[in-house]
Amino acid sequence: MKAAKACIDLSALQHNLQRVKAQAPESKVMAVVKANGYGHGLRHVAKHANHADAFGVARIEEALQLRACGVVKPILLLEGFYSPGDLPVLVTNNIQTVVHCEEQLIALEQADLETPVVVWLKIDSGMHRLGVRPEQYDEFISRLKTCPNVAKPLRYMSHFGCADELDSSITPQQIELFMSLTSGCQGERSLAASAGLLAWPQSQLEWVRPGIIMYGVSPFSDKTAQDLGYQPVMTLKSHLIAVREVKQGESVGYGGIWTSERDTKVGVIAVGYGDGYPRSAPNGTPVWVNGRTVPIAGRVSMDMLTVDLGPDATDKVSDEAILWGKELPVEEVANHIGTIAYELVTKLTPRVEMEYTK
């Protein structure tokens, strides 16, 4: 019997992608598969996200992995290329790139490429992380349009900083700025990622870029993906390796941070921070065992965690324990831990077995 295992429901992935298409019917879909498909397995995700019109990645290595496994659809390097030496690789493998800074623009102007590269100009519409500032926009447009290494027409994109906050005044300002700058442009545009396409439909332009929602995880702090009609793709599970009697007043685990207030039974589950489950998970973080949630009791260790099963528990060694999934939303677990679900699904370690089902 394996210990921690991540079960990936590929039919749920396909359901979610179809739902994105239904919610943004006038847009083409760029499925974002960076960070190993948000921890779900890049190659499997790309193979089964076959209704996507293109793929978005963060690193050139991810793009090359997609090409190596037979993906022929467009691939966009969302952070752009890191050095001039990457440009011939983009040409050879037909990879599109974002341009967000002067250094990338100069590299394109100085390169000697066999064929032009498809470029998306990233505009800093208000997040202030990457992108061309509005006062730089005209100069960048002029230089990119006259650069022989840039395929025409030029494309345009930006990224929201607060799209998951529905009362934010920043997002409408970002939309207004982006639309005013790109009004009348011939090239295609992209503004909405997961939160944008769900909460700000006016940002659904020629392309949308679903990321976390495609994996059945909500971008919002107050809603699960299931609340929004999406299905969890990942279920992280393990099993009980011990059920122990603990007396009132006895402490459990490193540091003795949990002390039992009554005689009870404590279950030991074969999963820990060595598998990517956060050591920071506090007492009370829920785990699903035999049809109910039970609280973590004690500090998460490298290979194990402990839960309070209750004094009348009938759970047995080898019974299944679900850390998150359909029965226990990953968003709920993340809220208890004080993090976001994105972090939980992307931080599983290689020793977690990946099991794919359709």
From Swiss-Prot:
Q: Which UniProt keywords apply?
A: Isomerase, Pyridoxal phosphate
Its function, per the record, reads: Catalyzes the interconversion of L-alanine and D-alanine. May also act on other amino acids.
Tell me which species this is from.
Vibrio parahaemolyticus serotype O3:K6 (strain RIMD 2210633)
According to UniProt, this protein's pathway is: Amino-acid biosynthesis; D-alanine biosynthesis; D-alanine from L-alanine: step 1/1
Which PROSITE patterns does the entry link to? ALANINE_RACEMASE (PS00395)
Q: Any one cellular component term from GO for this entry? A: cytosol
Which reaction(s) does the protein catalyse, per the Swiss-Prot or TrEMBL entry? L-alanine = D-alanine
Q: Pfam families, from UniProt?
A: Ala_racemase_C, Ala_racemase_N
Instruction: Please list the residues that make up the active site.
Output: 34, 254
**Gene Ontology molecular-function annotations:** alanine racemase activity; pyridoxal phosphate binding
| Signal sequence coordinates | none
* Superkingdom of the organism of origin: Bacteria
UniProt binding sites for substrate: 129, 302
Q: Belongs to which family?
A: Belongs to the alanine racemase family.
Q: Which cofactor does it need?
A: pyridoxal 5'-phosphate
Q: What is this protein called?
A: Alanine racemase
In the record, N6-(pyridoxal phosphate)lysine modifications are located at 34
- EC numbers: 5.1.1.1
